[in-house]
C-alpha cells in the first residue's frame, strides 16, 4: 500500500514538473479538461507563488525570446518587483529573427505589446489563444500591418507563437488570475534573443540591428528595475520610463520635452559600464566571424522526427540557436550572395529581398547608430546596458533601484487620459 502511495506521488510530481521546462519532453494530456477557461493552476505552481512571496492574482508580465524559443511568465512579488515564475519552450514560431512588417510575411511580432482581458480568446480553434495586440502604435506609425497574431496552442504557426495545449492552458491561467486580481493590462515583451553583450555582438551584422538596439533600451530598463517599463511611442520610436511636464505622446509626432528619473539614470549608467566591458570582450571573440540566422525550414528540419505519427497540423520548429551557425565573414558573404542569386532567379519580384540579404541596412525609421556600440545613443530612449551574463539578469542591481509608483503598462491602441489624482511614476523614484 505504501509503495503504491509513493508511486502515485512520484507520477504526480512528474506531471507537475512538466508545467515548466520539461514540457518539451513530458507533454501532459489535457483532453480530460472540461472547463479549460477556469482550469486552476497546479498545486506546485501555487506553492512556488507563495514561496516567492507573490499572490495568486498579482500582476504578470510575459517575455518571449525567439532565438532560443523561450516564453517566460514574470509575476509581481509583494515588494512590487517581478520575478520569473514559469518558463516554457515555444513549440513553434514561424519566419526568422526580426520584426513583423506586413500581412503574410510569416514573421512573429517583436516589440512591446499591451494585453487586456479582451485579448483572451477562450473559443480559439487552437485550444486557447491570447492575441499579441499587433499592430501596436509603434507598428501602425511605421506602416506595419497584420492580423490575428496570437500566442496559442496546437503547435502550428503562421506568424504566431504556438505552444502545446498543456502550456497554453497554464499561460492562459496566469493571465486570467492576474486580470481577476485587478490588473488592467499585461505587458508582452517579444525579443529576438536575450539582449546581452554576447548576443548583441554576435548579431551585429543583422539588418535589424537598429530596431533591436531600440528594443534593448526597454530590455535594460527591466533588467535594472525588475518592473515592466512604462512604454510610449513618439517620432515613430519607442521611449521608456520618460516623465513629461504636461506634454502628450503622439506616435508619429515630435516627442514632447521629457526626462529620465535621476535614480534610474544612475542605475542604468552603472549597468552600462558592465555591459561595455562585456561587449568589448565579445567583439574580440567574434572578430572576423558572422552569425548565420537559419530559415524556418532549417529549424523544422531539426525536429522532423517529432512529427512522425502526429496529425499533419502539428508543426514544431527547432531552436534557431541550434540551427544557426558561426561562420567566417568571407564564408558568410559568399553564402548570402548565393542565397540572393537563388531568390532573384526564382522570382524577379523578390529582388528587394535578395538585396537585403547581400547588404544589411538600418531601419528607415530608426536613427543609425555606431556598429561598435549596440546600445541606442538617443537620450530620449534612456540608453542603457545589459550585464555580461548570457541568461536572464538576476544580478541584484534591482534591489538598489526605486520602484515606479504607477503600474508601468505597455501602451494601448489609444493612450487613455491620465487621471489628475494618479501619482506619477517618477515621484516614487525620488522617494527612496
Predicted regions, residues:
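Proline-rich, low-complexity linker regions of envelope-associated factors in Gram-negative bacteria
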Residues: 227-432
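N-terminal post-signal-peptidase region of extra-cytosolic proteins
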Residues: 42-61, 73-75, 92-103, 110-116, ...
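Bacterial signal peptide processing site
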Residues: 20-23
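C-terminal motif of bacterial Sec signal peptides marking the signal peptidase cleavage site
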Residues: 15-18
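Short Gly/aromatic-enriched secondary-structure transition segments
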Residues: 78-79, 83-91
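Bacterial N-terminal signal peptides that target proteins for export
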Residues: 1-7
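Post-signal peptide N-terminal segment of mature Sec-exported envelope proteins
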Residues: 25-52
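Exported/periplasmic cell-wall-interacting domains
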Residues: 104-262
Amino acid at each position: 500500500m505504501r509503495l503504491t502511495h509513493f508511486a502515485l506521488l512520484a507520477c504526480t510530481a512528474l506531471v507537475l514538473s512538466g508545467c515548466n521546462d520539461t514540457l518539451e519532453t513530458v507533454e501532459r494530456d489535457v483532453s480530460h479538461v472540461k472547463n479549460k477557461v477556469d482550469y486552476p493552476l497546479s498545486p506546485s505552481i501555487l506553492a512556488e507563488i507563495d514561496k516567492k512571496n507573490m499572490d495568486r492574482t498579482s500582476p504578470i508580465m510575459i517575455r518571449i525570446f525567439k532565438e532560443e524559443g523561450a516564453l517566460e511568465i514574470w509575476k509581481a512579488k509583494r515588494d512590487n518587483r517581478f520575478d520569473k515564475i514559469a518558463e516554457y519552450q515555444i513549440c513553434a514560431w514561424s519566419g526568422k529573427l526580426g520584426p513583423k512588417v506586413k500581412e503574410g510575411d510569416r514573421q512573429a511580432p517583436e516589440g512591446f505589446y499591451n494585453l487586456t482581458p479582451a485579448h483572451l480568446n477562450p473559443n480559439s480553434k487552437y485550444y486557447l489563444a491570447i492575441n499579441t495586440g499587433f499592430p501596436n502604435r509603434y507598428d501602425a506609425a511605421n506602416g506595419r500591418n497584420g492580423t490575428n497574431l496570437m500566442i496559442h496552442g496546437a503547435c502550428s504557426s503562421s506568424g504566431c507563437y504556438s505552444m502545446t495545449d498543456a502550456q497554453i492552458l497554464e499561460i492562459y491561467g496566469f493571465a486570467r488570475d492576474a486580470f481577476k486580481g485587478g490588473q488592467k493590462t499585461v505587458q508582452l515583451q517579444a525579443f529576438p534573443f536575450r539582449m546581452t553583450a554576447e548576443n548583441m555582438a554576435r548579431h551585429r551584422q543583422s539588418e535589424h540591428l537598429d530596431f533591436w538596439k531600440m528594443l534593448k533600451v526597454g530590455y535594460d530598463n527591466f533588467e535594472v528595475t525588475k518592473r515592466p517599463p512604462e512604454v510610449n511611442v513618439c517620432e515613430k520610436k519607442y521611449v521608456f520610463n520618460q516623465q513629461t511636464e504636461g506634454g502628450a505622446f503622439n506616435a508619429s509626432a515630435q516627442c514632447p520635452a521629457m526626462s529620465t528619473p535621476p535614480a534610474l539614470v544612475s542605475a542604468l549608467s552603472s549597468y552600462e559600464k558592465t555591459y561595455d566591458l562585456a561587449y568589448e570582450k565579445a567583439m574580440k571573440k567574434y572578430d572576423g566571424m558572422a552569425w548565420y540566422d537559419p530559415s524556418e525550414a532549417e529549424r523544422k528540419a531539426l525536429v522532423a522526427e517529432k512529427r512522425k505519427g502526429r496529425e499533419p497540423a502539428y508543426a514544431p520548429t527547432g531552436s534557431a540557436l541550434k540551427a544557426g551557425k558561426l561562420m567566417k565573414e568571407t564564408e558568410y558573404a559568399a553564402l548570402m550572395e548565393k542565397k540572393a542569386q537563388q531568390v532573384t532567379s526564382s522570382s524577379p519580384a523578390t529582388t528587394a529581398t535578395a538585396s537585403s540579404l547581400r547588404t544589411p541596412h538600418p531601419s528607415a525609421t530608426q536613427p543609425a547608430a555606431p556598429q561598435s556600440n549596440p546600445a541606442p545613443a538617443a537620450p530620449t530612449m534612456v540608453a542603457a546596458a545589459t550585464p555580461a551574463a548570457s541568461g536572464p539578469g538576476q544580478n541584484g542591481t534591482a534591489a538598489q533601484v526605486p520602484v515606479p509608483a504607477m503600474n508601468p503598462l505597455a501602451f494601448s491602441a489609444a493612450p487613455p487620459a491620465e487621471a489628475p489624482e494618479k501619482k506619477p511614476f517618477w515621484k516614487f523614484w525620488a522617494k527612496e
